[in-house]
A protein has these predicted regions:
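Conserved small/polar residues in nucleotide/adenosyl-binding loops
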Residues: 1-5, 243-250
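Active-site microenvironments in enzyme catalytic cores
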Residues: 4-181, 188-192
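Active-site pocket scaffolds in enzymes
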Residues: 188-200, 206-207, 211-245
């Protein structure tokens, strides 16, 4: 395996953790870490300048499985308690430097926030949809496929990201919408498939464990689930409605 330049500067690691998961609305400090400018010879340490959100769903486990006992896809939803909104905050500049070859570490471990509400799978029964792959894409392998998953494995949930700047709060104005999409277009895998794949090699899940959906971005530009996608990596400004006086102006946020 080729060792990246960052290996000599930062202790590379990859992890999952529960210690820095909090409830939506919590205040946390801006993350710090190593970054390396394209024209710099060495990395530097400091606060992130590219803090980003990731629009996700969190799937909460209600009933676990024994070590060494995979959960079949036809039984996977019996192990799910419910669904919550998840914001998997990311420091993109830290991530760009540290993520090779294992993945993000300090760029994600500083905070993840959850909605204070969990919607049970039973309550979501009216909001189920067919699981269908886009034309031309491969069908799942047999262990990730079942009639029940094809018939109603997907969720039909509206996804929305709103931004409210300090100026907007001071003016008492409502947040501006950045993203409006739906899980039927944004989610490539179902919750049952995530549970089954996670346990297929015998990994045991426990009550209260959470599986993140990954960033939920639809095919249209205004369905992007993160700023890095919405701005095309910082190349395109995000415009929202800022109120600076009696008039409203479209101003880059």
């Amino acid at each position: 395996m080729c060792i990246r330049d960052s290996y000599k500067w930062v202790p590379i690691g990859y992890h999952g953790r529960a210690s820095s998961i909090g409830v939506s609305g919590q205040v946390f400090k801006r993350p710090q870490g190593q970054t390396k400018a394209p024209d710099a010879a060495e990395p530097s340490f400091g606060p992130s300048k590219r803090l980003d959100y990731e629009l996700e769903l969190g799937f909460l486990i209600g009933r676990g499985n024994a070590l060494g006992e995979p959960i079949a896809i036809g039984e996977a939803e019996e192990h799910l308690f419910g669904v919550t909104l998840l914001n998997d905050w990311s420091a993109r500049d830290l991530q760009a430097w540290e993520y090779q070859p294992l993945g993000p570490f300090l760029s994600k471990n500083f905070a993840s926030t959850l909605s204070p509400w969990i919607v049970t799978m039973e309550a979501l029964a009216p909001f189920r949809a067919k699981f269908e792959r886009p034309e031309g894409d491969p069908q799942p392998l047999p262990y990730l496929d079942a009639p029940s998953n094809r018939a109603a494995g997907a969720l039909d949930i509206t996804l929305e990201v709103l931004l409210q700047t300090a100026k907007m709060r001071e003016a008492g104005e409502a947040p501006a919408r950045l993203t409006l999409g739906n899980t039927t277009e944004a989610a490539y895998w179902t919750a049952a498939q995530l549970v089954t794949h996670h346990t297929v090699n015998g990994c045991n899940l426990q009550p209260g464990d959470m599986l993140g959906s990954g960033t939920l971005s639809g095919p249209k530009p205004d369905q992007a689930g993160s700023l890095i996608e919405l701005t095309l990596g910082g190349k395109q400004a995000v415009t929202c409605l800022l109120y600076t006086s009696d008039a409203a102006d479209d101003t880059p946020c």
